[in-house]
Amino acid sequence: MSRPDAPRWEALARAAAVLLLPALAAQSGCARSTPVAGDRPIEVLVSSDPETLDPRHVTDAVGMRATRLVHAGLVRLDADTLEPRPYAARGWRWLDGSTLEVSLRDDVRFHSGAPFGARDVVATLRAFASPAVGSRHAGVVDAIASAEAEDERTVVIRLSRPHATLLTDLELPILRADQAAAPPAPDGSLDGLGPYAVVHSGGGEVLLTPAEGSVLPRPRHAVVLRTVHDENARALRLEAGRADVAVNLISPTLLPALLAQPGLSSTRRPGANLTYMIVQESHGPLGDARVRAALSLALDRAMICSTLLGGRAEPAGGLMAPAHWAHADGPPLPHDAARARRELQDAGAEGMRVALLTSTERLRGDVARVLAQELAEVGVRADVITLEIGTMIARLNAGDFDLAILQLPEMTEPNVLRYFLHSNAIPPRGANRGRVRDARLDALLDEGDRVMDITARRAVYARLEALEREEMHVLPLWYEDQVSVTSDRARVFSPSAEGRWLALASIP
């Protein structure tokens, strides 16, 4: 099977957008029935329901972003630089190399009206570490030896070992002391400090109301997160004035037709998140680094970025995006189908058959089918399987796959790679779903966690990137821009570099 050249793919992409033009034209021929701004919440479209609204257990992208509207940590990450800034904390100071003193704000209360103080911080950190709670984020606090309340407004945190990312880790949502170790609350009923409180969740929507006394000034508008699986339905909802915000949910092929309609605009910024292909290394030939490297050689990243992704992505040369402080300069990952075919033959893997998992998003399915065709050209038969996100995550955690296309969520700190690649993070302890077991990689991940000097850490991650170019435990694909489509009333909205939605609270 021969792969269509790039011009043909561009033509097919344009044709796909044309399918929706008559519907949009019909809509634009009618008066837009946009409700008055104060009459309805700001509607944010999402492609899937959050798996849970409990910040102790959430791991999916929609759930992570939703819970960060409801809950707040001691710090938050700067929307542009991703550096830690005071949030529920007033400030902090290092007493020595392993002891951090955090002072708390006195103008913040929980949604219920309960006061916020040091005992809540201490209880939260202990709960996230507790095996009885079973938080998926327990690793974030595993370097904390103790947390003690010096007084109602001061917490002293002591580390058990050098740990470079403590301040970033304190972005962890703070819960009320009497709820921190409570049973799971997937409905979002845990008391929070964020700018919104959950009113209702279920039936494809999460309704959030502005909160008084939170870490931010009270937002002007309520927010509803609306699950709409089909891209055409999303576009029509935006055009009709029913929805206000869609982040990374309108494909490049459809975007120009949608933006031609009145009352809609788009913003774009470089993203910090990596789209990659995960490899199940315990499955036969996929455990061979030569095979994984050959699979990488088969993939024409630049062609997909320029066509299917509409130029709104940059081919990946490694795990960290170019704007990231830990990015290591290096040549782009090559595309060489002939060499890939030879290396597969040398490894005895020519003709192997694999299952390639992806989400039900139309664009993701299109991308997966192009990647499968490129793999077919080098002698690998990839059967594309599209799944709802919950089903897909369950299969990944169980190891029931060969290849899968994923996005590393919120690549704010390279230490997050420990959760996805360290041998101690194989599910259910973490998200090392490829079952990577590499002592050299573990050592570099551990070193990056404990080295405090930023220049020394950058050197550690440069060595890690060099190792990954040899081993290809994951196959980096590209870094996608954060692209938002907004209504006139939400035109000031822009997501942060890692894709969070806190700017919703600033919509006038």
Positions of predicted regions on the chain:
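Append "and occasionally in soluble cytosolic enzymes with long acidic Gly/Pro-rich linkers
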Residues: 287-373, 463
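Ligand-site clamp/hinge motif
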Residues: 211-256, 381
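N-terminal lobe/hinge region of extracytoplasmic solute-binding protein
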Residues: 45-96, 126, 191-192
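Long beta-strand-rich cores associated with HINT superfamily self-processing modules
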Residues: 484-508
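Surface-exposed binding/hinge segments that line
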Residues: 93, 103, 137-180
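Extracytoplasmic/peripheral linker and loop segments enriched in polar/acidic and small residues
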Residues: 383-392, 397, 419-488
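Aromatic- and charge-enriched surface segment that lines or borders ligand/interaction sites
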Residues: 91-134, 156, 237, 285-287
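Gly/Pro-rich hinge or "lid" segments in bacterial periplasmic/extracellular proteins
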Residues: 162-218, 222, 230-232, 337-338, ...
